[in-house]
Amino acid sequence: MKPENKLPVLDLISAEMKTVVNTLQPDLPSWPATGTIAEQRQYYTLERRFWNAGAPEMATRAYMVPTKYGQVETRLFCPQPDSPATLFYLHGGGFILGNLDTHDRIMRLLASYSQCTVIGIDYPLSPEARFPQAIEEIVAACCYFHQQAEDYQINMSRIGFAGDSAGAMLALASALWLRDKQIDCGKIVGVLLWYGLYGLRDSVTRRLLGGVWDGLTQQDLQMYEEAYLSNDADRESPYYCLFNNDLTREVPPCFIAGAEFDPLLDDSRLLYQTLAAHQQPCEFKLYPGTLHAFLHYSRMMKTADEALRDGAQFFTAQL
């Protein structure tokens, strides 16, 4: 798509989204576009500190979980001692960025609004770790907490997965992995998916949208994919292109959230239409005027807070 033919996204977004885009952090250096991936990860962590401020206080615990690849860091957010379920959260960041700190506020608000224990899993990033290592470590962490539930005083009888962007793909892929391989980690009662990618290679929204403002040009998306996957054949794996998995049976109830000006929006629409066509429990909600990654900005955006509340309400309705 010739850039001039794309939608003028920054003219079309909502007033509160524009406020976020125009919010400057004077002490923050420029984005290291030509820097190393380590420098970009460091910048991302610094940039998110402002947006994570003011999150609810609650009991938190950290555990290192053993996997066949080594140990993975996890963080538990416990809003109350008698949690009705446990929700595993997987952060976004194109598979190459992000950690438990960059998504701290999101996890705290989810825990507060759902009154469920939320466990963030700091899965290994790409390109150091290639598909399907992240999924395997997520599943290993779920199994570990299922086995240690009594010792850690968490309720693993009912669980869920949640994630944003790349984390949304990992959330649904992990749920399908557990189903397909018949691994019992507790009953999966819900999956919360904010503006994920689920396997489309091209779409209308991928053509019309995406730019320097969201880091989701076609070239960006190709770079994330190449960093994450081990080889070309992985593109068709049912745990990367989730539309190649069986979405006609035993898919946990899915809350699918879309951002209006997100190039990945058609992934969410197709996922919803596929699940709904096969009578799989699902709900789709579009958040007008928003860009990809808007969930981070609940400190300033009522719509972001609403999207988190909607996801939490969907999850608790399944209990």
UniProtKB/Swiss-Prot annotation:
This is Acetyl esterase. A motif (Involved in the stabilization of the negatively charged intermediate by the formation of the oxyanion hole) lies at residues 91-93. It comes from the Bacteria. Keywords: Cytoplasm, Hydrolase, Serine esterase. Belongs to the 'GDXG' lipolytic enzyme family. The keyword Isomerase does not apply. The keyword Hydrolase applies. It is an enzyme of class 3 (hydrolase). Pfam families: Abhydrolase_3. It comes from Shigella boydii serotype 4 (strain Sb227). The gene is aes. It is found in: Cytoplasm. Disulfide bonds: none annotated. Homodimer. Interacts with MalT and MelA. Its EC number is 3.1.1.-. GO terms for molecular function: carboxylic ester hydrolase activity. The active site is at residues 165, 262, 292. One of its GO terms (cellular component) is cytoplasm.
